[in-house]
Regions:
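A common structural junction motif
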Residues: 40, 80-90
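Helix N-cap motif at beta-to-alpha junctions
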Residues: 66-73
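Short glycine-/aliphatic-rich beta-strand segments at the starts of folded cytosolic domains
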Residues: 9-29
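Short beta-strand/turn micro-motifs at beta-sheet edges
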Residues: 2-8
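Short, low-order "capping/linker" segments at domain edges
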Residues: 101-115
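Short amphipathic alpha-helix segments
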Residues: 28-49
Length: 115
């Protein structure tokens, strides 16, 4: 009896860096989380938990989300599809992906993105 080799493997993680453009003001974590939740439901009809989506770091304009590695493309699509946060029109530009928070922070934010 052969088992598929990917069974029992723990999920691998990806972190995606992004920048909110098109507006001067910064946003709250909860407003960005809400926009991500709504967009995920709108596009895929699923919950953010299904993709492992979590806002890990965010400073009002720049942030980092977590997802399971098999959903990296979908996660990027969700971020880039968001065009409103609250009542503000925005664009979200993804700036990099990595398997660790530390290397994404170094590569995409010069190590400056705090919790």
């Amino acid at each position: 009896l052969l088992l598929a080799s990917n069974q029992n493997k723990k999920p691998r993680h990806r972190y995606i860096g992004f920048i909110i453009t098109g507006v001067e003001k910064g946003f709250s974590r909860s407003a960005v989380n809400k926009a991500i939740r709504e967009e995920t439901l709108k596009i895929f009809g699923k919950k953010t938990e299904d993709f492992g989506l979590k806002l890990i770091r965010f400073n009002g304009k720049e942030g980092m989300i977590h997802c399971f590695h098999i959903y990296k493309t979908e996660a990027i699509h969700i971020l880039q599809s968001i065009n409103k946060i609250g009542k503000e029109n925005v664009r979200i530009k993804t700036v990099g992906t990595s398997g660790t928070i530390k290397s994404l922070n170094k590569k995409s934010f010069k190590g400056k993105l705090e919790r």
